[in-house]
Amino acid sequence: MKPYSDNIIFYDSEFTSLDPYKGEILSIGLIKMNGEELYLELEYDGEVSDFVKDNILPYLKGKKVSREEAREKIRKFIGGKESYLVAYVDSYDSIYWNKLFKIKDSTKNNQQPAFWMTIDFASMLFGLGINPESYNYKDKDNFYKKIGVDASKYREHNALDDAKLLREVYLKFYQSISKVMPK
């Protein structure tokens, strides 16, 4: 099995709330197939959920950039060729990506630098008969062990580390697909 395209950028974001009407993106991590990466922490001084206060904010210690700066840096990082964005579960990442790029209509794609349709890795696993929850390193049927990924070297809830982990999993997954496919 071979993916449709190798023009892929793995991404993850951390945000203030699961409520897309109130939430805003706090950080984003992107990594290309070749390993080139971009990590940004965005300016924000509004309300955040208790989970974010306890699990995200204490680790956001980098220089903060404005949303406009973030859009410019992401456009420069992606370059002129539309890439496919891959997230583990893209539900929230896509919402906050669209909010960052002020996208209200996916048919008018000129506002963002990537292909409008994000790829959801959890759905790929599900479609192949693999429990998407096994991606959680705490799961007893640990997917990582099956494909030879040491998830302990990545910080949980860090946008760049989550994107790096997804890239490593994706690459190993395609190398060892016969090991992980249900019998």
Where are these regions (language model features)?
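Generic detection of long, well-ordered alpha-helical segments
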Residues: 64-71, 160-164
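Two-metal-ion RNase H-like nuclease active-site motif
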Residues: 6-16
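Metal-dependent phosphoesterase core characteristic of DEDDh/y 3'-5' exonuclease domains
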Residues: 2, 6-7, 21-26, 32-57, ...
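Short, basic/hydrophobic alpha-helical segments
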Residues: 67-82
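Glycine-rich phosphate-binding "P-loop"
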Residues: 56-64
